[in-house]
Amino acid sequence: MSEFSDYYVVYQRVGEHAMVLVGHKNDTPRALTANQFQENTNRWFYFENGFRDEDTSQGIHHQLCNLHMSGRKMMVKRELYLALRHIEIAGAQWLRAVIINDDDTYHDDYHYLNFYENPVDEDYAYYDFVDFDKSEYKAKKYADYLPPLYTFKKVVLSPEKLAAVPLEKRLIWDDLQFTDCLVVHKSVKEIMEKYQPLDCRFTRIEEYQEDMGTRAEYDADGNLIC
């Protein structure tokens, strides 16, 4: 298998650990989704379960773990952060984060990976699309600062485009304009797996489908993939 196929999309697993993490209402992080926060990073950023009331009313209590995904937002505990912080990530920065659990317990040993600018432009993406038509993009924007998300059925990596960039500069990347996916190299995936990332799944980028992470997934025998 080609060295250029060793990439995985990281996304949220559907299950008991899954939380929709949002910035606390009295703090700044809601603006982080604009990918523009580049100020002093020595402060703390607070996040909480966006569906806390609904979950607790149904008796759902979330267990915090070493890695949490909420959409393409990734938060990792300090031990995993220390294992990843040496990696050069274009257009991104690590911010110190606090997750407020549903029982109002503050967990201040997390770091949030904030992409403050799009590291991949339209003319220099690392992949091509199959069954992709720019005229079919979703016209509705979620907010003024979010670009339209294009519809795709399959992503195919481009060995030529990848070869033009040293491996150490493309171990972790996120295309904010087209697929809106967090992508990691196999070597990074192996580091993450050592820390039992219960809240996320890894799927080879060429097997990734647009709605993964928003629905339950089943194996060939019809069993729920947990």
Residue ranges of predicted features:
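Short N-terminal signal/transit or membrane-insertion segments
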Residues: 34-53, 86-106, 226
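A broad, low-specificity signal for short, low-complexity segments enriched in glycine/proline
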Residues: 28-36, 53-56, 72-77, 140-146, ...
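Extended, non-catalytic structural segments that build the interaction scaffolds
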Residues: 64-74, 173-180
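Acidic, proline/glycine-rich low-complexity IDRs
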Residues: 2-7, 106-115, 119-226
